[in-house]
Amino acid sequence: MPKSHRPHGRRLSTLTVVLSIGALLGGPAVASAANDTAGFITQAPAQLRPLVDGVDVKPLLTVGEQIGSYRFESIPDGIAIDPRGHTTFDLYVNHETSKVPFPFTPATGIGLVDFDNAQLSHLVMKRGSGRILSGEYAIPSSANYQRFCSNFFAGPEQGWSRPLVLTNEEATDFVNRTGTAWPAGAGAEQAGLAVAYDPATGAFRSIYGLGRMNHENSVAIPGYGEAVLVTGDDTFSAPASQLYMYKAANADGVWNDTGHLWAFQSDNAAINDYGDLSGSASVSGHFIAVPDAIADGDQTGLETWSNANHVFQFIRIEDLAYDRNDHHIVYFADTGEPRAVRNAAGLLSRAPAGTEGPFPNGRIFKMVLDETDPTVVDSLSVLIDGDAGGYRNVGALHQPDNIETTENSLLITEDPGGHNRFAGATNARLWKYDFATGDMTAVAVVSDPTADWESSGVVDASQYFGNGAFLINVQAHNVFVETNPTPVNPAGLTQKREGGQLLLIRIEGA
């Protein structure tokens, strides 16, 4: 049975002090609980702005601000909302931080590193206003997880009698799980795990059976009478990504890791990778069982097994979401890769930097699962083809990253690659795709027009804020709220706390 952890001192920090974060974020952000409206809300400028009428943006919490002893840490990413709240509710925010330096030059010891390992924030928020009443770290830095990306709250809506927050490491590094995470020593293990957090007990544990890969998200699909999770490999070595499914008897089976991993395989050997699908074409398929030893092993073993067993090869799978009107439909983003080209054998491979291949912008895929057996795929097709827009096209979707669905729309965040930062380009946008009409509209963009910023973690918050309301994060990568020479790691490393913000966005008609 997997070992679970309970962080010490889990009492929530209530609002007593707010930290000024300085001119880099537009001046000090100061507020007090001793006013006519309880709870904290940032006074920093919004890091996201509307692009069309009918869109309203409200900043809620900015990196570096404190609520009691809790500080909102850098690189906020996935957001999961507990739907069981009333006048207040719980939300869980991932932090994509790591104490493994990146970038890093081993020969010189020069590089950048975050102050903390990955963490999962637990915030209590007021319905309607978005004011934050308290905060804590549900999964602390001391757990030595790396780069939490997207997350998902699985509960009654997905048929889970035991609610769990599922979070995910997007990392390949070998790290120590106790003590100092890096550099790796004896007994270190490779990162790339899915992690389950139990809100009822505060315990968390690694779910090794969900596979070791660059997990972006693990999303629970309702309607099958068992726990069904879909996940993908957000590989750093694109094009080398696969779509996986984890099945267990129920939520307890996920918690105890008694489920098994499955991998998607096409029914047509001639349509077996990202480039084989285009236009309105589709292919059926099925998920094949992955041996437990492979699923529990390292990332190289899983990649090797997937190639040997002709698992469908995507380029770089990002976030996933199911259709709110038909739960058997799953949408997922693939960010594309300009260096992805076919080699002499006709297989997708990675060409040198500067290559302008046929897949520069990415896609949104649509997968229709069988209504009774989730391992049977009725069809896989391309819903939105950003690649068709070509290079240096402002109007094209650029590197889709996080996604969310409502009954009406699909919301898509961008994380543009360097090749999409051309003269005249816009910065990272939030798009709305209308299911009824197929129209794509860019509804918001990060506030800095040129810097390395992205929006992330978009999640439907209409239950607590009304129709068309979402929570979303911004990662302001080039804004360093705080830096410090590292006291114990090799000379030349600088600790940094990147800027970012949690916001409420309302989108009319979404």
Language model regions located:
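Secretory targeting and sorting signals
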Residues: 5-33
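Sequence/structural signature of beta-propeller domains
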Residues: 31-510
